[in-house]
């Protein structure tokens, strides 16, 4: 009973003031074991929450990008306050099966948690290394030496939760154990999951995604952690939905309005085509022809057209249209059955509108994606999530404004996230350089407190490797010295002395501590080539004594 009361008090804290749970504190305690455990990721989760709330209060944003490895994490820590771990990057570069591929979430489900652990271990290691180094300094030296907070909270890609409820629960457990401060889960079907900027995305019903979010929150509660939960929706550009079971989705599902197709479903037509030996382009032509005849519309669009065709006066027509728009406004989430009843009262009888006829061969319904559809999902997800993210097809401030105003009209304190995607051709967006520079702070004022370039690490890695490899092939070591070594020095990049960066001094401290303060085999002892980097250089170039120049690296002669 004491533990149940403790959990309830925790839920009553400011942290969870806006969070809705369909289960009780007793349910949570009953799922815990007798051995109470604590997790380092929980400290990072609390840090992340405070950081995001501060950004929300200040109208600013945490900006970050997907990190590939410990090198990127340590360099990002000097300038950015969060770290992102991208499923796309993991899929293409670091799956646990070592089989690369596109972002279809078909890699082993421990892939992203393992990358989180890889980076979290690196963060902790470089934090320990820095502390040991600073403890060897005098007070004056410490004051002169910038401190780097390597322990930046990690937010990781949870894709669709990787299956049913139990799969989501186990995935979330892995993330907590591996060091994630936050995760995001999207509302696509786990069977057909695609990168948010690919075609063919299939949504799940609103209620199914809520179940995923509840499963994640329950697992966090069982573990006693405050992991930040981000709910992503792909409803802005999706054109298919798995099910019509949730009435909140009905207003966005498309149906056939051409009565000539009654009883002639697309799926049956495609099956007949395949039976006749058609394939590829022929089947596509069949589908395209059928869809061109179908006159697909939402129920509301079909009713509006039917009212406009009625042989009545203009004033009466306007009255009926206004009444219909009142009843069918998107915030009411009118069901198909309710819509038909209201339409009949407005004189729309025997309306032909069939959402089953255009279903795909896989059984998916046609969906009309939009910002409004995303807003409706944002409303539904907000009580169960800490941050809401709408995936978009382009960097559009107007869409960002519509989504922000829509979601926050019902949930005014909701925090928002935004993908500053490299899948966008930013130069083709119509923005000037100044507008691109101001994009992050501009939408931050709309509540987008966490903004990230999902695949930023991969692109930066590819660019430097490609340009350096080409130059190195032509100019040899001069290319390395000019492009890398001198630039590391000019920009204060600590990998210039890579032995020190990797922690050779740190482990020398272990050796000397074990051996009473002296170790003849210390890695950074006499003879280490990194001594060459201890001098300060006035400029790069060959030694010219009469001009007072100093060599880039001390000669070994």
Curated annotation (Swiss-Prot):
Main localization (coarse): other
Localization terms from the record: Glyoxysome
Pathway: Carbohydrate metabolism; glyoxylate cycle; (S)-malate from isocitrate: step 1/2
Needed co-factor(s): Mg(2+)
GO terms classed as biological process: glyoxylate cycle; tricarboxylic acid cycle
UniProt similarity note: Belongs to the isocitrate lyase/PEP mutase superfamily. Isocitrate lyase family.
Name of protein: Isocitrate lyase 2
UniProt organism field: Glycine max
Lineage: Eukaryota, Viridiplantae, Streptophyta, Embryophyta, Tracheophyta
């Amino acid at each position: 009973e004491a533990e149940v009361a403790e959990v309830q008090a925790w839920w009553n804290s400011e942290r969870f003031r806006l969070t809705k749970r369909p289960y009780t504190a007793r349910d949570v305690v009953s799922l815990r074991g007798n051995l109470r455990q604590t997790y380092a990721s929980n400290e990072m989760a609390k840090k992340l929450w405070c950081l995001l709330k501060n950004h929300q209060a200040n109208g600013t944003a945490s900006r970050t990008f997907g990190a590939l490895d410990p090198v990127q994490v340590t360099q990002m820590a000097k300038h950015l306050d969060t770290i992102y771990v991208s499923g796309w990057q993991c899929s293409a570069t670091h799956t646990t099966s070592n089989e690369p591929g596109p972002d279809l979430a078909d890699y082993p489900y421990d892939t992203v948690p393992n990358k989180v652990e890889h980076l979290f271990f690196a963060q902790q290691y470089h934090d320990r290394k820095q502390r040991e180094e600073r403890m060897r300094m005098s007070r004056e030296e410490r004051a002169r030496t910038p401190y780097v907070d390597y322990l930046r909270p990690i937010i990781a890609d949870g894709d669709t939760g990787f299956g049913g409820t139990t799969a989501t629960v186990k995935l979330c457990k892995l993330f907590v154990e591996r060091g994630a401060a936050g995760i995001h889960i999207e509302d696509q079907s786990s069977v057909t999951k695609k990168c948010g900027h690919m075609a063919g995305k299939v949504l799940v019903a609103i209620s199914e995604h809520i179940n995923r979010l509840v499963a994640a929150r329950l697992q966090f509660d069982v573990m006693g952690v405050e992991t930040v939960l981000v709910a992503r929706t792909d409803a802005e550009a999706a054109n298919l939905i798995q099910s019509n079971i949730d009435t909140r989705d009905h207003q966005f599902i498309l149906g056939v309005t051409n009565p000539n197709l009654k009883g002639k479903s697309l799926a049956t037509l495609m099956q007949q085509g395949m039976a006749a030996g058609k394939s590829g382009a022929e089947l596509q032509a069949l589908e395209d022809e059928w869809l061109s005849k179908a006159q697909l519309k939402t129920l509301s669009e079909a009713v509006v057209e039917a009212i406009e065709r009625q042989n009545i006066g203009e004033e009466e027509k306007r009255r009926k249209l206004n009444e219909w728009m009142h009843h069918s406004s998107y915030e009411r989430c009118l069901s198909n059955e309710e819509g038909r009843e209201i339409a009949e009262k407005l004189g729309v009888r025997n309306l032909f509108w069939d959402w089953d006829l255009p279903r795909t061969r896989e059984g998916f319904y046609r969906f009309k994606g939009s910002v409004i559809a995303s807003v409706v999902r944002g409303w539904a997800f907000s009580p169960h999530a800490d941050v809401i993210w709408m995936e978009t097809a382009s960097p559009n401030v107007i869409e960002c404004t519509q989504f922000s105003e829509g979601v926050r009209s019902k949930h005014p304190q909701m925090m928002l996230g935004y993908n500053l995607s490299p899948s966008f051709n930013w130069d083709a967006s119509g923005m000037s350089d100044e507008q691109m520079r101001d994009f992050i702070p501009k939408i931050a004022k709309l509540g987008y407190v966490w903004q990230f370039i999902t695949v930023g690490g991969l692109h930066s890695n590819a660019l430097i490797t490609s340009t350096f490899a080409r130059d190195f092939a032509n100019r040899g070591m001069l290319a390395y010295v000019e492009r890398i070594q001198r630039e590391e020095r000019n920009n204060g990049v600590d990998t210039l002395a890579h032995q020190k960066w990797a922690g050779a001094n740190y482990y020398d401290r272990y050796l000397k501590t074990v051996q009473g303060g002296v170790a003849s085999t210390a890695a950074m002892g006499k003879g280490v080539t990194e001594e060459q980097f201890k001098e300060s250089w006035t400029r790069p170039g060959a030694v010219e004594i009469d001009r007072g120049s100093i060599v880039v690296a001390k000669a070994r002669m």
